[in-house]
């Protein structure tokens, strides 16, 4: 079975990864919108 320590490490790693992906997504989406406005 999975121990409490392993579960804690897994959940913290997944949470941090998802958080960073969301921040990266917002950065890319904002940069794309800004670039599209400059082209017009």
UniProtKB/Swiss-Prot annotation:
TM ranges: 7-29
Pathway: Protein modification; protein glycosylation
Keywords: Endoplasmic reticulum, Membrane, Signal-anchor, Transmembrane, Transmembrane helix
Gene Ontology biological process terms, A to Z: protein N-linked glycosylation
Keyword Translocase appears in the UniProt entry: no
Subcellular location, principal: endoplasmic reticulum
Topology class, membrane: Single-pass type III membrane protein
Topological domains, Cytoplasmic: 30-40
Subcellular localization(s) per the UniProt record: Endoplasmic reticulum membrane
GO CC annotations on file: oligosaccharyltransferase complex
Membrane topology (Lumenal): 1-6
Record has Transmembrane helix as a keyword: yes
Assembly behavior: Component of the oligosaccharyltransferase (OST) complex.
Sequence similarity: Belongs to the OST4 family.
Function statement: Subunit of the oligosaccharyl transferase (OST) complex that catalyzes the initial transfer of a defined glycan (Glc(3)Man(9)GlcNAc(2) in eukaryotes) from the lipid carrier dolichol-pyrophosphate to an asparagine residue within an Asn-X-Ser/Thr consensus motif in nascent polypeptide chains, the first step in protein N-glycosylation. N-glycosylation occurs cotranslationally and the complex associates with the Sec61 complex at the channel-forming translocon complex that mediates protein translocation across the endoplasmic reticulum (ER). All subunits are required for a maximal enzyme activity.
Protein name: Dolichyl-diphosphooligosaccharide--protein glycosyltransferase subunit 4
Gene designation: ost4
């Amino acid at each position: 079975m999975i121990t409490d320590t392993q579960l804690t490490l897994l959940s913290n790693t997944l949470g941090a990864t998802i958080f960073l992906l969301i921040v990266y997504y917002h950065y890319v989406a904002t940069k794309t919108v800004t670039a599209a406005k400059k082209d017009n």
